[in-house]
Amino acid sequence: MTVEQKTIGIVGARGHTGSELIKLVAAHPQLHLSFVSSRELAGQRVAEHNDAYQGQLRYENLDAAAVAAKAADVVILALPNGMAEPFVAAIDAAAPQTLVIDLSADYRFDPAWYYGLPELTRGSYAGQKRISNPGCYATAMQLTIAPLLDQLAGPPQCFGVSGYSGAGTTPSDKNNPALLSNNVMPYALTNHMHEREVSAQLGVPVEFMPHVAPHFRGITMTVNLWLQQPLTREQIQARYTQRYADEPLIEIVDEAPWVSRIAGKHGVQIGGVTLAPGNKRVVVVATLDNLLKGAATQAMQNLNLALGWDELMAIR
C-alpha cells in the first residue's frame, strides 16, 4: 500500500540545523519538500547548498503570511529564539490543520504545546498539532537525570560543553573559531534557558553551567547527582539499561563517552558511571550531536510520531 506523501516547509533553512533538516527530509520516503525560507539565500537553488537534496527548489524569503498561505502539511520553524510567534499566529489563523514543529525555546513552557522528547514524553502525545522541540543541552540533561530522578537528594549539577555550531550562524564570540582556538568559553552560568526548561520538565531544580569549545558539533554533558541512599554501580547501570532498553537512539556504554564519536550520529551515548566514596554521589556523562538528536533528528522523530509513521523513518 502506498502512503500519501505529505508536504513540508522549513523556515530558517540557512542555519546549521536547517541544513540537517533538509537532509532528513530528502531521505524521507513520505515527505515532499515544498518550500524552504531563508532571507539570505533567497533565489538560490537548495541543491547548490545541500548535496543531499536533488531538485530545482529554490530558497524563498517568506514572511509569516506567505508561509501560512503555502498550507503545507508540516512546517518546521528553525528560527532563533523570539521569532516564532508571528509564524505560529499566521498558521493558526489561515491553516490551523498544519503540523507545526518549533525548534526554538519560544513554546517549551506553553502547556498547549506538546513537548517532544520522545524517549521521555512519547506517552503524553495526544494528537497535538503544535510541537515544541527540546533544547540540545536540555535533551542531554533530561535523558541523563531521568533514570535516577526518584533517587535525587538535591539539585543535579550539569556541566555542559558544546561545539560552536550551537551558537548558530550569526557571528558572535561563541562561534568565532579564532577566539575559540585553544579556549573554552563559559557563559550564562546561572538561569540559562535550558536550566529553566529542564527544571520545569523534571519538576526538580537543576543547576547548569554551559561552555562553548573549539569543535564544531557535539555536546558533552557531565552530570553530578546526589542520591538519597547508597546505590552500587551495577544498580545505577541497570536503571539506565532498563529505562532505555527499547530506545534505539540511546546507547548505554561502560566508559565515559567521547563527543568525537557521536558527532554526525543521530543518537545519544550515556555512560562513565562513577561513584564517590559512600555511594551517595554519582557522576554520569552523556554525549549527543546538538544539530541532530539535539535538534533535527528529534524534530523528525516528533514529525513521524505525529503523523503515525515509524518514529525513525529517515533516521535509521
Swiss-Prot record:
InterPro entries: AGPR_AS, AGPR_type-1, NAD(P)-bd_dom_sf, NAGSA_dehydrogenase, Semialdehyde_DH_NAD-bd. It catalyses: N-acetyl-L-glutamate 5-semialdehyde + phosphate + NADP(+) = N-acetyl-L-glutamyl 5-phosphate + NADPH + H(+). It holds the Pfam family Semialdhyde_dh. Keywords: Amino-acid biosynthesis, Arginine biosynthesis, Cytoplasm, NADP, Oxidoreductase. Disulfide bonds: none annotated. GO terms for molecular function: N-acetyl-gamma-glutamyl-phosphate reductase activity; NAD binding; NADP+ binding. GO terms for biological process: L-arginine biosynthetic process. It comes from the Bacteria. Pathway: Amino-acid biosynthesis; L-arginine biosynthesis; N(2)-acetyl-L-ornithine from L-glutamate: step 3/4. Gene3D superfamilies: Dihydrodipicolinate Reductase, domain 2, NAD(P)-binding Rossmann-like Domain. The active site is at residue 136. Its main location: cytoplasm. It is found in: Cytoplasm. Catalyzes the NADPH-dependent reduction of N-acetyl-5-glutamyl phosphate to yield N-acetyl-L-glutamate 5-semialdehyde. PANTHER family: N-ACETYL-GAMMA-GLUTAMYL-PHOSPHATE REDUCTASE, CHLOROPLASTIC-RELATED (PTHR32338:SF10), N-ACETYL-GAMMA-GLUTAMYL-PHOSPHATE REDUCTASE, CHLOROPLASTIC-RELATED-RELATED (PTHR32338). Belongs to the NAGSA dehydrogenase family. Type 1 subfamily. HAMAP family: ArgC_type1 (MF_00150). This is N-acetyl-gamma-glutamyl-phosphate reductase. It comes from Xanthomonas euvesicatoria pv. vesicatoria (strain 85-10) (Xanthomonas campestris pv. vesicatoria). The gene is argC.
